[in-house]
Regions:
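Core alpha/beta catalytic barrel or barrel-like domain that forms the active/cofactor pocket
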Residues: 84-93, 122-137, 152-163, 252-258
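Membrane helical hairpin/interfacial module
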Residues: 101, 105-152
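Buried hydrophobic positions in well-ordered alpha/beta secondary-structure cores of metabolic enzymes
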Residues: 87-91, 111, 174, 187
Length: 268
């Protein structure tokens, strides 16, 4: 029998947002969570062994997440980044779909702030790749005020149809997006969420954006048109391990995500 004590009031989704890819939010009259009989189950009650979460949480949850991120990022050796150089923080659209998007935006902001704090480098930019909609991250950048946070001309949404750059790898020439690599250094800002596990069975998930969000369509299409999602995992790894990318790779910052929320940050 169902334990009624496990049932809680429905957790409401984030409010509908204006987008060129969706309907006007004013047309959304009712959410599924508002239908009769709906409830929410708390995973921490079903699985007590789950670690505590930072977010969702109280009103200061995002502030706590920022502090956790800064503590981890301050441990990273960034001594090779010089004040007069440039750094691109690389992000992917998936991160903005996690728990409303705010936690990923916080990680991006903290990554920027830590670089400036530790190195004195002022030319820190954001390059955010897309999923199925070529300009969706431009909307995310504005929605989370990342354009204001980074400053004029420092943020860009990049798409697989943008100008490319050839990257020589152990399997031949593959193609990245030129704007992704137009800085002295790159920082890979990602997450551990497993919702897209069907694409890769967790094989090389950590570097998948190098063959997707950061790649030109000729290379990105290997996941879907050429070899299939799982067989094509080697393309992202090949790009990441290429001499060109390794010459620019500084470090990575990851949002650690459980099925019940954000549990931490890892940077290395």
């Amino acid at each position: 029998m169902c334990n009624e004590n496990l049932k809680h009031a429905p957790i409401m989704p984030i409010a509908a947002k204006p987008s060129q890819y969706g309907i006007d939010p004013s047309l959304v009259k009712r959410r599924v969570a508002e239908l009769p009989g709906m409830c929410s189950l708390r995973l921490a009650e079903l699985f007590p062994e789950l670690p505590p979460v930072i977010y969702p949480g109280g009103q200061d949850a995002l502030d706590k997440l920022y502090q956790v991120a800064m503590e981890e990022l301050r441990k990273v050796d960034m001594s090779f980044i010089k004040p007069g150089q440039s750094v691109n923080i690389l992000a992917s659209h998936h991160g903005f779909t996690l728990l409303g998007g705010q936690p990923y935006a916080i990680l991006i902001k903290a990554t920027r702030d830590a670089i400036i704090e530790k190195t004195g480098c002022k030319d820190v930019r954001l390059r955010a790749g897309v999923g199925m909609r070529f300009r969706e991250t431009e909307e995310y950048i504005r929605r989370y005020q990342l354009d204001e946070y980074f400053g004029p001309g420092k943020t860009k949404g990049v798409a697989p149809i943008d100008e490319g750059i050839p990257i020589e790898t152990e399997v031949g020439t593959l193609y990245g997006i030129k704007a992704v690599y137009d800085a002295d250094w790159i920082v890979h800002c990602h997450h551990t969420d497993v919702r897209e596990v069907h694409f890769h069975r967790q094989v090389d998930k950590a570097v998948k954006p190098f063959g997707m969000s950061y790649a030109r369509i000729e290379t990105r299409s290997t996941y879907h048109q050429n070899l299939g999602p799982r067989a094509a995992n080697f393309t992202a790894r090949a790009i990441f391990e290429s001499p060109f990318v390794q010459s620019k790779f500084a470090f990575a910052s990851f949002l650690n995500v459980g099925p019940h929320g954000v549990i931490g940050v890892d940077a290395d």
